[in-house]
A protein has these predicted regions:
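Hydrophobic, well-ordered beta-alpha structural blocks that scaffold small-molecule cofactor pockets
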Residues: 1-45, 50-52, 59-60
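Alpha-helix C-terminal capping/helix-to-coil transition sites in glycosyltransferase folds
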Residues: 12-13, 68-70
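Hydrophobic beta-strand scaffold residues
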Residues: 39, 57, 94-97
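Short basic, glycine-rich beta-strand/loop surfaces that mediate nucleic-acid
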Residues: 71-77, 107-128
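An accessory alpha-helical subdomain
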Residues: 11, 125-161
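Residue-level detector of alpha-helix initiation sites
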Residues: 23-24, 80-81, 127
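Short amphipathic alpha-helix with an adjacent loop that forms part of the alpha/beta core around
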Residues: 61-69
Length: 161
C-alpha cells in the first residue's frame, strides 16, 4: 500500500519541469502557477490555456537531458511507456517525479489544494480517492469565511497554554 508523507517543499529558485502539454499537464501547470512563476513545460504541442501561464514553453519532444539540473518533474504525457522512461530518467538524476495517473510510480503526489493569502489547505488520500479529497477541499473552501471568522477562538485557546 502506498504511503505519502504530507510536507511542504521550498521550490524557490528550483528548476521545475512539466512534460506534457495536454489536459493533465495544463491542470498541473495551472495549480503550480499559484506557487511559482518559474517552470518549464516541454511538449511537441500545447493545449489552449498554456500561453496564459507564466512558464517557459518548449515546443519539442522530450529528451533525457531536459531533466538535467531539475529539482522535480511532473510527468503528464498520454504515453504510458514514455512516462515510465521519463520516471527512470528522473530517478537516474535524483529528480523527484510525479507520474500523473500512476501513483505507484510517484515520488510525490499533489493534494487537492485550497489557497487564500498565506494559508494553504491540502487534502490528500495517498492517491487512493482523489475525488473524495477534492470534495473535502471544496467543502473547506465553501465554508472558509465561516471557519476563518471563528479561528480567533482557537488561537486564543492555543495561546493560553
Amino acid at each position: 500500500m502506498l504511503s505519502f508523507l504530507p510536507i511542504n517543499i521550498n521550490i524557490e529558485g528550483r528548476r521545475i519541469i512539466i512534460v506534457g502539454g495536454g489536459r493533465v499537464g495544463l491542470h498541473k501547470a495551472t495549480i503550480l502557477a499559484r506557487f511559482t512563476d518559474r517552470a518549464t513545460v516541454i511538449s511537441p504541442e500545447f493545449r489552449e490555456g498554456f500561453s496564459q501561464l507564466p512558464f517557459t514553453l518548449v515546443r519539442k519532444h522530450y529528451e533525457p537531458s531536459d531533466l538535467d539540473g531539475a529539482f522535480l518533474v511532473y510527468i503528464c504525457t498520454e504515453d504510458a511507456l514514455l512516462n515510465r522512461q521519463i520516471k527512470r530518467d528522473a530517478e537516474a538524476r535524483g529528480v523527484l517525479a510525479s507520474v500523473c495517473d500512476s501513483p505507484e510510480l510517484c515520488d510525490f503526489t499533489s493534494p487537492a489544494i485550497f489557497r487564500k493569502d498565506n494559508l494553504t489547505v491540502a487534502v490528500a488520500s495517498d492517491a487512493r480517492d482523489v475525488h473524495r479529497s477534492m470534495s473535502i477541499r471544496d467543502a473547506i473552501r465553501d465554508n472558509f469565511d465561516y471557519l476563518e471568522a471563528h479561528s480567533h477562538d482557537a488561537r486564543s485557546l492555543y495561546h493560553k497554554h
